[in-house]
A protein has these predicted regions:
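Basic/aromatic DNA-contact patch characteristic of tyrosine site-specific recombinases
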Residues: 1-59, 63-71, 83-86, 111, ...
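A short linear boundary/processing microfeature
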Residues: 44, 48, 98, 155-158
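Short, intrinsically disordered, charge-balanced linker/junction segments flanking boundaries
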Residues: 158-164
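Short linear capping/connector segments at secondary-structure termini
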Residues: 107, 151-157
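Short clusters of hydrophobic/aromatic residues that line enzyme substrate/ligand-binding pockets
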Residues: 2-8, 101, 149-152
Length: 164
């Protein structure tokens, strides 16, 4: 059943009207000649607003990783930061940089870790720890609603040193 809409007369034509809040919280009027048409316009507009809000709230993996590296620069030595930066850019941003933080799943991360698993065990382990740290920080900052790395383990990846 359609909601009850108000009516407005404009230039001798009867229109149905509703108001919705846009992404900035400002009321926007939507007009249509029939209640069905107005309902369709309203649902489409609300969908677009929801989509815009979602994209505004969740940055891309690349954007958030750069921000995370900047935040880490306060806590770690310069050599550690250089190591983090190299691994984040090579193994995280290169694989998932264009995806939004809220859209990343455990499967995406595990697929991104496949090339890393061919590297040494220590590189694999540190990249997994970086993934976990970055997504934990995003969760704590309320950038994402759930942490996809919660079940990710450092076990089983990488080539042991004596086998190389």
């Amino acid at each position: 059943m359609l909601p009850q809409y108000g009516t407005v007369m404009k230039r001798g034509v009867l229109y149905y009207r509703t108001r919705i809040k846009d992404t900035n919280g400002k009321l926007v009027a939507i007009y249509a000649k029939t209640p069905e048409e107005l309902y369709n316009k309203e649902t489409l507009a609300l969908e677009q607003i929801e989509n815009a809000t979602f994209h505004r709230k969740t940055p891309t993996v690349a954007e958030y990783c750069e921000k995370w590296l900047l935040m880490q620069s306060v806590h770690v030595r310069a050599t550690t930061l250089t190591d983090y930066t190299s691994k984040v850019r090579r193994h995280i941003i290169a694989e998932l940089g264009d995806k939004r933080m809220g859209e990343v799943s455990l499967d995406d991360i595990q697929l991104a870790l496949v090339p890393v698993s061919k590297k040494s065990a220590s590189v694999y382990k540190s990249v997994v720890i970086l993934y976990k740290s970055i997504f934990r920080a995003a969760m704590e900052s309320r950038i994402i609603d759930h942490n996809p790395t919660i079940y990710l383990t450092t076990k089983g990846g990488g080539v042991p040193q004596e086998d190389r």
